A protein has these predicted regions:
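Active-site acidic/histidine proton-transfer and metal-coordination neighborhood
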Residues: 1-84, 159
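Histidine-acidic metal/acid-base catalytic patches
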Residues: 43-47, 51, 65-176
Length: 176
């Protein structure tokens, strides 16, 4: 599932995904989102999940407040361990993260895994960066695209990924 992304203040009906710390207005938005909406909501949900014997896994996905390792660890630390990660490396690659290192950092809180690949088209990214809003139907012009496993990263990378998952104790499903 996804963490959601509140607006920039009470009454806003559209999400506001903050991606930078300047100007200071953005930090105020983040403070409001996390302290007034995200943490209270997911703390309550964590309790309800526990009462029901359910674990909930966030897919760390750009556009939502939980989109990287740091935000995943924060929501878990502040809300509880009925919340964990649905680990999908495809969203991390194009953000410039190394998913194998993220798996190590998330040891003990990975509840599900997607085997999905992506690739950054360096020539497009060199001109436009990776926060790309172009349609997925316009792959030739996008800075990054989703790929079948092995068509973005090689077999050695995938072997290292699955081995690292096992090393940190993950023994669950892999969804393709």
């Amino acid at each position: 599932g996804f963490s959601g992304c509140p607006g920039s203040g009470p009454g806003d009906k559209k999400p506001n995904w903050v991606t930078c710390a300047w100007p200071p207005d953005y930090l105020e938005i983040l403070d409001w989102q996390w302290n007034e909406v995200v943490l209270p909501y997911w703390s309550k949900m964590n309790t309800e999940l526990g009462d029901a014997g359910v674990k909930f896994a966030f897919e760390m996905h750009p556009g939502f407040v939980v989109y990287n390792t740091d935000t995943m660890l924060r929501v878990r630390r502040e809300c509880g361990d009925n919340i964990g990660a649905n680990f999908d490396p495809s969203h991390l690659f194009w953000q410039g993260m190394e998913p194998v290192e993220c798996v190590k950092a998330l040891k003990g809180c990975i509840y599900h895994v997607h085997a999905k690949d992506s690739i950054v088209h360096q020539t497009n990214a060199a001109v436009n960066g990776v926060n790309d809003y172009k349609s997925y139907g316009d792959e030739i012009n996008r800075s990054w695209i989703f790929r079948t496993c092995g068509y973005g990263h090689d077999l050695k990378w995938w072997n290292d990924f699955f081995s690292t998952l096992r090393m940190v104790g993950y023994d669950g499903a892999i969804s393709i």
